[in-house]
From Swiss-Prot:
Protein name listed in UniProt: mRNA 3'-end-processing protein RNA14
GO biological process: mRNA 3'-end processing
A GO term, aspect molecular function: mRNA binding
PANTHER family: CLEAVAGE STIMULATION FACTOR SUBUNIT 3 (PTHR19980:SF0), RNA CLEAVAGE STIMULATION FACTOR (PTHR19980)
Keyword Nucleus found: yes
Principal localisation: nucleus
Cellular component GO terms held in the UniProt record: cytoplasm; nucleus; protein-containing complex
Keywords from the named record: Cytoplasm, mRNA processing, Nucleus, Repeat
Source organism of the structure: Kluyveromyces lactis (strain ATCC 8585 / CBS 2359 / DSM 70799 / NBRC 1267 / NRRL Y-1140 / WM37)
Job description of the protein: Component of the cleavage factor IA (CFIA) complex, which is involved in the endonucleolytic cleavage during polyadenylation-dependent pre-mRNA 3'-end formation.
InterPro entries: HAT, Rna14-like, Suf, TPR-like_helical_dom_sf
UniProt HAT repeat ranges: 62-94, 99-133, 143-179, 190-223, 264-296, 305-337
Length: 661
């Protein structure tokens, strides 16, 4: 069997997206399981399940060196995924009869160090497991017991007081203390102090099983000393009641939250591991609600303790919805607000980009941080890494699912968008030459990018020099690939109208109208040119254009098109002021259709007090927003030839016949 090595092909770069460069396109023997899995990981380095499959294969063959190497790759990519560290530690615990400190302690040091700051309870429980195995109370006596108690207390301070679902830890700690058999009165006193301190800590925190713990505590105090029990219980009662109430609040806001990541290799399956580029939006919203709830500091903690609690929740969210950019963005900004060290934001954004390399949100946020610190090479590296990842995703999709036009077009749009931002960023930092260089690369991508790249570059050229010549040449280049794209032609016309290139507007219009197959976009092109001609040309030329328009679209409402021609500041005042029934978002109260005629007529009905309904005016009695939203989706009144609903008669019926008790 192959050892899984192969000559690595270069990944698709910003200048080449040939699908043949995909790592999974390498030719391998059918039996080369390891090689194939390594290729798949190289192509999709954020797919945790691929690493798990590879790990299980290495474990089955007892290839421990390869197991460690694979775990190291996982940890480098997902350093804050505590459940992956737990998988590694549980594997070590299971395969060793005697614990090897030289193997386990470096792993614990890496994952629990201040640099990473993993504060997940399941990971710290692995730490407790190791400490207890290493320090046997029977053989180690008082020294071993003190070490274990210190370890438990570290876990209390690091994460147990922040975790609402931590009953397993508290039970384990209590069980350890309760089974301590003191050999003298001093040790008995010590034991009582430790247990009381533990109860006073846990019963003040909003967490599960508080009621049962409270009963257990009150009974324990009675057993220790009936004379002092009431005093100790009374001192804790108010805090316990508050914690119980807060826990109920927490349960309500986190209803439906899923926290079931596997912590051993055998538990890990494709269904219970996060999938790259996927996350449950509903789960994300619950996490955001939990974070918002914690930000209110309902426990009235000190600033440092509140920050530690917020950090705990953020890092929990970063594990369970690790492919949601919003979590990383929010966590980075929160840490930036709470720390004087500006590099903290950069650190968390980099961790986020490792997890979601195709995220434009994280790439742009990180590049902003580098720009503020004038780190130009890092800016380019950050944005290009995002571009390369999108290139590879696009190449894979075009090869694996070439008929999925919607997904392909979405990736093309995203790729183009990131290039547009990249052009603007480098123009801002290094000037027009840098922007042109990027545009030159984009041109070589041909139809892998959308026409927006040409439009954006044209605007950049124009805004820098106010010279339309270069900008128009850029847009002409776009016609080579997008001459039949109605959306591109529309935006091209927008630019020409913006810079008042009258002759080019006419030229583009005449050369494009027979190439556009989308009738809606073609209609927009006609309307745009007619409106422009009405502003800068002659009435005869407008009439000529209108004639051609009506011949091509005989179904259009000529009055409506007439009013569109007389817009001012893009507002159709003719419809708003005189033909208001044509406007969907404003409807007068007293417009009705006469039953005996198809002609529209306004009727003014008299109220009982003789007051006529007034015509609606923008500055009088504004329509409530809810009504406006309803009116927006209703069809125009002119589509109804008879009165469907007699509002006045209905109001009279309600007034005269209905009595509200």
């Amino acid at each position: 069997m192959s050892d899984g090595t192969a000559t690595p092909d270069p990944l698709p770069s910003s200048s080449n997206t040939s699908t043949s460069l995909r790592p999974t396109s390498r030719v391998r023997d059918e039996s080369d399981v390891i090689g194939k899995l390594n290729d798949m990981i190289e192509e999709q380095p954020t797919d945790i399940f691929l690493y798990v499959k590879l790990l299980k294969h290495h474990v089955s063959l007892k290839q421990w060196k390869q197991v460690y190497e694979t775990f190291d790759k996982l940890h480098d990519r997902f350093p804050l995924m505590a459940n992956i560290w737990c998988m590694r530690l549980s594997l070590e615990f299971d395969k060793m009869e005697e614990l090897d400190a030289a193997v386990i302690e470096p792993v614990l040091a890496r994952c629990l160090s201040k640099e990473l700051g993993n504060n997940d309870l399941s990971l710290w429980l692995s730490y407790i497991t190791y400490v207890r195995k290493k320090n046997d109370i029977i053989t180690g006596g008082e020294e071993a017991r003190n070490i274990v108690i210190q370890a438990f207390q570290v876990v209390v301070d690091k994460c147990a007081i922040f975790e609402p679902k931590s009953i397993q830890f508290w039970n384990e700690y209590l069980h350890f203390l309760e089974h301590w058999k003191p050999v003298n009165k001093f040790e008995e006193q010590q034991r009582v102090q430790y247990i009381r301190k533990l109860y006073k800590t846990l019963l003040c925190q909003p967490m599960d099983c508080l009621e049962s713990m409270w009963q257990r505590y009150t009974q324990w105090e009675q057993d220790v000393n009936q004379l002092t029990a009431r005093r100790h219980i009374g001192e804790l009662s108010a805090q316990y009641m508050n914690a119980r109430s807060l826990y109920q609040d927490w349960l309500n806001i986190t209803k439906g939250l899923k926290r079931n990541l596997p912590i051993t290799l055998n538990q890990a399956t494709e269904s219970n591991l996060p999938k790259p580029n996927e996350y449950d939006v509903q789960q994300l919203l619950i996490w955001l609600e939990w974070i918002r709830w914690e930000s209110d500091n309902k426990l009235e903690l000190s600033d440092d303790l509140h920050k530690a609690r917020m950090t705990y929740v953020y890092m929990q969210a970063a594990q369970h919805v690790c492919f949601a950019p919003e979590i990383w963005f929010n966590m980075a900004n929160y840490q930036g607000e709470k720390n004087t060290d500006s590099t903290v934001i950069t650190k968390y954004l980099k961790l986020g980009q490792q997890c979601i390399p195709n995220s434009a949100v994280l790439a742009f946020s990180l590049s902003e941080q580098y720009e503020l610190n004038t780190k130009i090479p890092e800016i380019e590296t950050t944005i290009l890494s995002c571009i390369d990842r999108i290139h590879l995703d696009l190449a894979a999709l075009m090869e694996d699912d070439p008929t999925n036009e919607s997904a392909i077009n979405q990736l093309k749009s995203k790729l183009t968008y990131v290039y547009c931002v990249y052009m603007n960023t480098m123009k801002r930092i290094q000037g027009l030459a840098a922007s042109r260089k990027i545009f030159g690369k984009c041109r070589r991508l041909k139809k892998l990018v959308t026409p927006d790249i040409y439009l954006e570059n044209a605007y950049i050229e124009y805004h820098i020099s106010k010279d339309t010549k270069t900008a128009c040449k850029v847009l002409e280049l776009g016609l080579k690939y997008f001459a039949t794209d109605g959306e591109y032609i529309n935006k091209y016309l927008d630019f020409l109208i913006y810079v008042n290139e009258e002759s080019q507007v006419k030229s583009l219009f005449e050369s494009s109208i027979d190439k556009i197959s989308d009738s809606h976009l073609l209609k927009m092109i006609f309307q745009k040119v007619i409106f422009f001609e009405s502003k800068v040309g002659s009435l005869n030329s407008v009439r000529t254009l209108e004639k051609r328009f009506f011949e091509k679209f005989p179904e259009v409402n000529k009055l409506e098109e007439f009013t569109n021609k007389y817009k001012v500041l893009d507002v159709n005042y003719l419809q708003r002021l005189e033909l208001d029934y044509m406007v969907r978002d404003v409807m007068p109260e007293a417009i009705a259709l006469d039953r005996g005629s198809n002609n529209l007529k306004r009727t003014m009905r008299e109220e009982e007090d003789g007051q006529a309904f007034k015509k609606f005016k923008a500055n009088e009695d504004p329509i409530p927003p809810e009504i406006v939203e309803l009116l927006k989706v209703l069809p125009k009144r002119q589509y109804f030839k008879v009165t469907i609903f007699e509002a006045h008669a209905f109001s009279e019926f309600l007034s005269d016949k209905v009595t509200i008790q």
